[in-house]
From Swiss-Prot:
Disulfide bonds: none annotated. This is Gibberellin 2-beta-dioxygenase 2. Residues 170-285 form the Fe2OG dioxygenase domain. It comes from Pisum sativum. It is an enzyme of class 1 (oxidoreductase).
Length: 345
């Protein structure tokens, strides 16, 4: 039986059909920057169309993902246990969180990809490595374009203030490919010998959480399941669109914008009849990068909300918690009145 973290169980929040913000990247730049900021403020999530990622780059990685996940369990395990990179099945993180999925997790570093390719695609490692690198380069460029638009919309003097973090050669960015088999197949020995107790569409594929990185660039096949939570606690189903990308604000960007952008909480429910495959590029800083609100974001009316921390420190804190726990609270600046109260004791 799959046991998600307590916070990743299906909650009683209402689910509502709401239009997801869609941003056409072919629009005039000043208009684009305003739309990006608005979407990040209101939802922490939006869809981009007319992007620059070539269709063939997407389709080639799709084919590799389908080929890998169609292998039997023993072949997939030969790709290496996810510690953290490699193949994983049901386990999400080190603290007991689980979901109805299997996945490949890769570091974006080309050398790391080359090494992993030898076990993931033994019969064509160079081809696999090239396909993954092409995809990462394309979505990284898309990420930087969006971050520069956000900086312009926030009137940050240096428009590269955010994108340069991702462009750094030591960036800790990741690529993850998730595969959610149909619920009815999860009891099949070719997938996993464990049996599930329910076969309805409320099974957790991936529990409720926010992403710790700066931005997540996501796309999937034509099978739904992804839901995002609004600031008011409503769950919004996200319609799949294999040719386009969805953008999620992560915890690190929430800090960099001093809370003006809020990381989006999301989850994935499994499908009873069709497999879902999704790809996420997690844009992250280098491990030693000091993360704190941009100076433009801190004013007398908007005091600093977070104390500085390195990306390595935040990762360590995140991995010490359960999937659905709120991580940023421990990095918030204490209110002045709290400090005064403590001194008076």
């Amino acid at each position: 039986m799959v046991v998600p973290s307590p916070t990743s169980m299906i909650r009683t929040k209402k689910t509502k059909a709401v239009g997801i913000p869609t941003i056409d990247l072919s629009l005039e730049r000043s208009q684009l920057s305003e739309l990006v900021v608005k979407a990040c403020e209101e939802y922490g999530f939006f869809k981009v169309v007319n992007h620059s990622v070539p269709k063939e780059v997407i389709s080639r990685l799709d084919e590799e993902g389908i080929e890998f996940f169609s292998k039997n369990s023993s072949e997939k395990r030969q790709a290496g246990t996810s510690t953290p990179f490699g193949y994983g099945c049901k386990n999400i993180g080190p603290n007991g969180d689980k979901g109805e999925l299997e996945y490949l997790l890769l570091h974006s570093n080309p050398i790391s990809i080359s090494e992993r390719s030898k076990t993931i695609a033994k019969d064509h490692p160079i081809k696999f490595s090239c396909i993954v690198n092409d995809y990462i380069k394309a979505v990284k460029d898309l990420t930087c374009e969006i971050l520069e638009l956000a900086a312009e919309g926030l009137w940050v003097p240096d428009k590269s203030s955010l994108s340069k973090i991702i462009k750094d050669e030591h960036s800790d960015s990741l690529l993850r490919i998730n595969h959610y088999p149909p619920v009815k197949k999860l009891g099949n020995d070719n997938w996993d010998p464990s049996k599930i107790q329910n076969s309805n569409n409320n099974n957790i594929g991936f529990g409720e959480h926010s992403d710790p990185q700066i931005l997540t660039i996501l796309r999937s096949n034509n099978v739904g399941g992804l839901q995002i939570s609004t600031h008011h606690g409503l769950w919004i189903p996200v319609p799949p669109d294999p040719s386009e990308f969805y953008v999620m604000v992560g915890d690190a960007l929430q800090v960099l914008t001093n809370g003006r952008f809020v990381s989006v909480r999301h989850r994935v429910l499994t499908n009873t009849t069709k497999p879902r495959m999704s790809m996420m590029y997690f844009a992250a800083p280098p491990l030693n990068w000091l993360i704190s609100p941009l100076s433009k974001m801190v004013t007398a009316h908007s005091p600093c909300l977070y104390r500085p921390f390195t990306w390595a420190q935040y990762k360590q804190a995140a991995y010490a918690l359960r999937l659905g726990d709120t991580r940023l609270d421990q990095f918030k600046v204490q209110k002045q009145e709290d400090s005064n109260d403590s001194h008076s004791l």
